[in-house]
Amino acid sequence: MSRSAWKPPFCHPSVLRLVNRALKQGSINKVIKIHSRASVILPNCLGLKFAVYNGKDYIPVSVNDQNMIGHKFGEFSPTRKFAGHNGDKKAVRR
């Protein structure tokens, strides 16, 4: 079920504070480390660089596309590593 239309988009207060501080200081190239994967990317985040925590490492996310606005930070920071499918053992044996 989607979020109610009357509610504003969720963005953690600490993320908003860090974004506003970066915009006020003019430090656009500085990476902002965040843990809140559920926060929505807002229009004022455009042009900033983030490091989103996936449970082990910080994954760099650069918000430089208009299409990223409205998505969540967690969508761009995968938490699982794909190990690949096992090949056919008969084909390897030949």
Curated annotation (Swiss-Prot):
Pfam families per the UniProt record, alphabetical: Ribosomal_S19
Keywords, in A-Z order: Ribonucleoprotein, Ribosomal protein, RNA-binding, rRNA-binding
UniProt cross-references to InterPro entries, sorted A to Z: Ribosomal_uS19, Ribosomal_uS19_bac-type, Ribosomal_uS19_SF
SUPFAM superfamilies documented for this protein: Ribosomal protein S19
Gene Ontology cellular component list: cytoplasm; small ribosomal subunit
GO biological process: ribosomal small subunit assembly; translation
GO MF annotation terms: rRNA binding; structural constituent of ribosome
Keyword Acetylation: no
Family the entry assigns: Belongs to the universal ribosomal protein uS19 family.
Role according to the record: Protein S19 forms a complex with S13 that binds strongly to the 16S ribosomal RNA.
Name of the protein described by the UniProt record: Small ribosomal subunit protein uS19
